[in-house]
């Protein structure tokens, strides 16, 4: 998970938070807000947990590890308590080593080059809607070299067992 910034025409600075599955490069959550606090940073995590586990509940995501940097949002007690509540183990990257969170950093670069730097947004709400569309497009269309040029959606489909697909 990580954060970047952009600017909207009418509302000024907006913070964009993302969560990316390190295994298949799928964007599992994306969010924008004027505020850059720990509660906003949790939103993409909650989105991903709700999408892939069906709810946001105590220990529902046990076994997952969450890679994040040492930013104040991610190291805050509120953030750490929330992910622990979900059953997620924190996995902070090394200080001043952005490559330790390389999958998230690469997604942010792709997001900037294909959306944030090439399009203007009037409001944060317009930005949010564009981010949701971008995440959907990315998961279904972006070819990931380390997965032999398959999309994140194709990789996830191949990871699913027949029982998972039936559920």
Kindly give the residue locations of the regions a language model identified.
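C-terminal domain-tail junction helix/linker
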Residues: 77, 84-88, 110-167
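Hydrophobic (often cysteine-bearing) scaffold residues that line and stabilize catalytic clefts
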Residues: 16, 37, 41, 67, ...
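RNase H-like polynucleotidyl transferase catalytic core
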Residues: 62-70, 84-103, 119-123
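Anionic group-transfer/hydrolysis microenvironments
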Residues: 4, 23, 31, 71, ...
């Amino acid at each position: 998970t990580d954060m970047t910034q952009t600017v909207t025409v009418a509302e000024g600075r907006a913070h964009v938070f993302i969560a990316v599955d390190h295994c298949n490069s799928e964007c599992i959550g994306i969010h924008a807000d004027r505020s850059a606090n720990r509660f906003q940073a949790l939103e993409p995590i909650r989105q991903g947990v709700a999408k892939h586990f069906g709810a946001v509940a105590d220990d529902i995501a046990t076994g997952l590890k969450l890679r994040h940097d040492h930013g104040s949002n991610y190291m805050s007690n509120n953030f750490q308590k929330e992910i622990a509540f979900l059953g997620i183990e924190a996995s902070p990257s090394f200080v001043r080593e952005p490559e330790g969170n390389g999958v998230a950093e690469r997604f942010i670069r792709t997001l900037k080059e294909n959306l944030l730097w090439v399009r203007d947004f009037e409001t944060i709400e317009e930005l949010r809607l564009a981010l949701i569309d971008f995440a959907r497009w990315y998961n279904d269309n972006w070819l990931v070299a380390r997965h032999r040029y398959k999309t994140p959606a194709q990789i996830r489909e191949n990871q699913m067992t027949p029982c998972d697909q039936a559920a």
